Structures are given as structure tokens and as C-alpha cells.
């Protein structure tokens, strides 16, 4: 298949890996963060870390919108859904994200709440149109990739006069948390590790372009390479980052030239700007409060803002203290470092959002990485023996 098969050529990937090994300075280490959950899954699925030299390490970042959603927002959605007049529409990967005290949207649905899984914003609009007596709330979540579809849904609701449709907005932004990881004293207090460069997200960058990364590449002197999701995309991006570090450069480079431009999708950006504005601050799981890290509806659309329309309150809630999801999202730990992983925390019984979402680092390690981890442990024991 064009643009897929040729980017999964194992022999080419091994050739690029050999170039990385040849270029990587053995006297130093390289730590690169892949921000996006799609890259995390590609690295785990195709075993890319096994191709890299020991001094080139990948760090999982907070690029999973479901994973970074704080427990309080889940609790607020559950409380709203339990109201008899409410129909809450949500994507499937939010259904099992744990709230406080073992709650979840799935359990609330079993308890009688009208919660419906949808595949797009259009599904929620159709429900609002077909059931005018119900207050239909769409649980909007995602990075810049999915925000335009929410904007278009709101535009359609206004045009069709759907007064029973509203949005619980949890759209988050990409550049802000990267900057937060690099400069926030709160995040440093929680713990982070040295990062030499970033693999920039693919789908997000098709919307926002590469220009938004220029500021922190220059300000924090960290190279960024925007890359696609196929294994050759990712390993080529790692090669480009190694070259930049060796050269002392800190530029934004675009590996994903077949889909990403400098300016991105300006029409989509305009639709988003029409309906949304920046929040001064928004809590991210694992990072704390991130300034300008999320969006909300503009005041003129307050009638469609579920938080204002239904006087929603986001309660203060703490993560399971045994769950390392927050540390994993900051790049401090890997899934195998969590004592819950693979024991009480599995895809069937998730203790944290990193195991629930298909983009989560724990879900990726469960699906692809845990077996290689066991092989490494066996090899290490044999080497000692």
C-alpha cells in the first residue's frame, strides 16, 4: 500500500539504525522524548528501541489526551451524566478511565446513566436532533487534531438550531506542555529527566504546522523533528535528532513532509479560533497546572458550554498513589517501573488512564513490550551466570 509498505521496510530500518550507531558519540548519552502516543506505539510495536545503541534512549511523553485528563474531569462528567435529563456522548476510550473510588463512565452507565459511545461529533449531533427532549452533551477531548471537528459540530448545531446540544470541552494543546516540561519548577519538583530533543507529533502538526515549535526550540535550545507514525518515519527522526545534537543545532525539522507543512491547515485553525479561546490554566495529569494548555468555548457560545449551562464543578481528586501514570507521562518512569503493571493493572482491570487509552504508554508496553522485557531479563541473568 502506497505510503505505508515502503515505510515498514525492515532492511531500511536496520540501515538507518546502523547510521545512528555510527553517528552516536559513545562518550555521551542521548535522551529523546517522543511526545505523541502514536509514536510510543510505533516504537513498541516494531521494537525500534532494540535497534538503537545503548546510549540512545527514548522517553515516553504526555501525548495522549485521555491519559493526561485529570480524575476530577472524569468525576465531573460522571456527576453530570447521572442527572436524569442528560445524555452524555463520549468516545469509547474514555468509558473505562478510572475516576475517584473506582468509578468510571462505564460503571455509571451500568448504574443507569444515559451514556452513549459515539464515533464522531456527528453521531452526537444526530442524537440531539432525534431526541429534542434530551440534553445531549458531547464529551469533547483531544489535541489540535480533533478540535476542528468539535468546532464544526458546534457550527452545525447553531445552524440547525439544536438548543439541546452542548459541549464539555477538554481539548488540550501540544506546545504548552512541552514548554511546561522544560521550564516549570512544579514539574521539576515532581521529577523529570534530561531531554536532548523531541520527536514532534504527526497528526497534530498537520493542523498546526511546524511553526509553533520554533519558539521553544530556540528558547530552550532543544531540537524538534516532526515525524510520521511508521517505523521508518520514527527511526529517521531519531537519526535527524542525533545529527542535530552532534552539530550543536536546535532547529525544527520536518521529517513528515508528505503530510505536514510549516503553516498547517489554516482553514481548520480559523474554525477553531472562531469558537474557542485559551484557558489561562488547565490541570494535566502528571504535570499539574499547565498555563494556556487547553481551550474553552468563547463567551458568546456560553449557551453551548456544558460547564456553564449545567454549573458543572470539577472536584479536587487524587490519583491512585500506587499508580505511576503521572511519572510515566512526565518521562520519569517507564511502564515496567510501576508495581501495578501486569498484576492488578491490565487492560481488563486498568488502574490508570495510561493502561486504558490505546495511545497510552502502558497499553503499548502491555501489547508489545512486556515480552521483550522478559527476554532482556533472561539474557541479563545468563550474562551474569
Swiss-Prot record:
PANTHER family: HYDROGENASE MATURATION FACTOR HYPD, HYDROGENASE PROTEIN ASSEMBLY PROTEIN HYPD. This is Hydrogenase maturation factor HypD. The gene is hypD. Pathway: Protein modification; [NiFe] hydrogenase maturation. It comes from Rhizobium leguminosarum bv. viciae. The keyword Iron-sulfur applies. Keywords: 4Fe-4S, Iron, Iron-sulfur, Metal-binding. Belongs to the HypD family. NCBIfam families: hypD. Fe cation binds at residues 36, 64, 67. Its cofactor is [4Fe-4S] cluster. One of its GO terms (biological process) is protein maturation. Involved in the maturation of [NiFe] hydrogenases. Involved in the biosynthesis of the Fe(CN)(2)CO cofactor. One of its GO terms (molecular function) is 4 iron, 4 sulfur cluster binding.
Amino acid at each position: 500500500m502506497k505510503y505505508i509498505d515502503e515505510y515498514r521496510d525492515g532492511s531500511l530500518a536496520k540501515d538507518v539504525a546502523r547510521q545512528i550507531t555510527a553517528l552516536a558519540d559513545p562518550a555521551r548519552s542521548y535522551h529523546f522524548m517522543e511526545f505523541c502516543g502514536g509514536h510510543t506505539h510505533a516504537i513498541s510495536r516494531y521494537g525500534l528501541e532494540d535497534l538503537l545503541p545503548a546510549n540512545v534512549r527514548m522517553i515516553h511523553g504526555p501525548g495522549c489526551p485521555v491519559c493526561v485528563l485529570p480524575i476530577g474531569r472524569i468525576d465531573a462528567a460522571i456527576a453530570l451524566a447521572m442527572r436524569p435529563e442528560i445524555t452524555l456522548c463520549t468516545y469509547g476510550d474514555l468509558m473505562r478511565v478510572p475516576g475517584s473510588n473506582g468509578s468510571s463512565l462505564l460503571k455509571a452507565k451500568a448504574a443507569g446513566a444515559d451514556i452513549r459511545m459515539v464515533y464522531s461529533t456527528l453521531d452526537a449531533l444526530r442524537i440531539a436532533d432525534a431526541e429534542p427532549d434530551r440534553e445531549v452533551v458531547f464529551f469533547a477531548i483531544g489535541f489540535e487534531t480533533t478540535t476542528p471537528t468539535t468546532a464544526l459540530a458546534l457550527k452545525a448545531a447553531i445552524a440547525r438550531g439544536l438548543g439541546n446540544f452542548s459541549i464539555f470541552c477538554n481539548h488540550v494543546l501540544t506546545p504548552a506542555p512541552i514548554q511546561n516540561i522544560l521550564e516549570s519548577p512544579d514539574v521539576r519538583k515532581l521529577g523529570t529527566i534530561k531531554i536532548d530533543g523531541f520527536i514532534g507529533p504527526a497528526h497534530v502538526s498537520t493542523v498546526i504546522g511546524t511553526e509553533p515549535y520554533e519558539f521553544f526550540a530556540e528558547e530552550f535550545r532543544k531540537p524538534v523533528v516532526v515525524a510520521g507514525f511508521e517505523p521508518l518515519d520514527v527511526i529517521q527522526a531519531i537519526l535527524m535528532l542525533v545529527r542535530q545534537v552532534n552539530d550543536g543545532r536546535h532547529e525544527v525539522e520536518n521529517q513528515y513532509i508528505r503530510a505536514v507543512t510549516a503553516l498547517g491547515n489554516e482553514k481548520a485553525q480559523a474554525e477553531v479560533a472562531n469558537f474557542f479561546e485559551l484557558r489561562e490554566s488547565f490541570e494535566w495529569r502528571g504535570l499539574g497546572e499547565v498555563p494556556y494548555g487547553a481551550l474553552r468555548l468563547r463567551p458568546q457560545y456560553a449557551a453551548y458550554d456544558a460547564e456553564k449551562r449545567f454549573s458543572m464543578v470539577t472536584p479536587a481528586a487524587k490519583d491512585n498513589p500506587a499508580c505511576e501514570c503521572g511519572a510515566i507521562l512526565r518521562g520519569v518512569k517507564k511502564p515496567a517501573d510501576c508495581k501495578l503493571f501486569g498484576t492488578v493493572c491490565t487492560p481488563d482491570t486498568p488502574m490508570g488512564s495510561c493502561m486504558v487509552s490505546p495511545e497510552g504508554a502502558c497499553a503499548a508496553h502491555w501489547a508489545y513490550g512486556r515480552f521483550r522485557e522478559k527476554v532482556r531479563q533472561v539474557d541479563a541473568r545468563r550474562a551474569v551466570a
